[in-house]
Amino acid sequence: MFDAGWVPKMATVPRQHITQKKIAEHVQRLGELYPPIPLDSVDRTIKRRWLVARKFGHVIDYLARVELEVDRNVLELLVLLPEADETNKTFYADVWQPQEIQHGLILDRLQQDLGRTAADPHLDVSFGIKILGALAHLKPIQDIAKLMYFLTGASTERQAVIAYNKINRGMQQLGETAISETIITPIKQQEPGHFAFYQMSATAMIQDKVLKPWQLFLTRVMREKSYNLVGTNKMKLYKADMGGVMADLGLDDDLEGYAREVGRVENRLLWAHKQGMEFPPYILKALKESVELYRERLARGLTVAEEFG
């Protein structure tokens, strides 16, 4: 059963109309309240290095890599949203990227303190993004790309919030207070604000009827065909790694409950006409695929290097 007790409640659908002014004010507050976490603010004390590495080493490896891929994410946004407004530019260039890169650097140093290898982020912009970017100067296409970006952001940030809360709970149970209080807690405090930005922005597009019915239809089709879990980058290696993250955090015990948490925003905005559907089926499909790939890896007794090297 999915344990929602430790999952912080995200903002529900706002009843009032979301204006661009409200979104801009939210971005400004994020920048003021949560400056990037300084490396020298971290207490590097680890009481039982071997135990932390055994229980959370793989998860920290994965999250460090994903956070360090923010520079590629920004490049993708420059391709997909060539006419992004000032609020979006401020968010991804002045708030999100500086915060996320520090998360990655801090986690990367932690994993090396645990005796593990440094992160190797995947920084190549995909061919699919480049193709879509070639059409992004057309406003109808850019509007679709923008909604896809907001939905992807909401999904990935929700996954991050759940993971960091699970890790924090685990570190506290291990008595690793330095890691909990000076690494995981500061990081997890910044992620919900990112989620709120994506949720507000996507909701505003639907409320304002920015997309015509044919654009929404195409968005649904593209979302169904292109959905990926955070950090998997459409690669089997990373999909199996993500399956390992879910297993280590105990999220594989109730994949439907996890899918419900991850897919709440797009289920409401894209699939409201499908009454009774709790989450888009493609999210559960992606979760199952990652877990199955991870279990296949375990069954073969292979390391990542042996399997994909």
Where are these regions (language model features)?
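Non-heme di-metal
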Residues: F2-G309
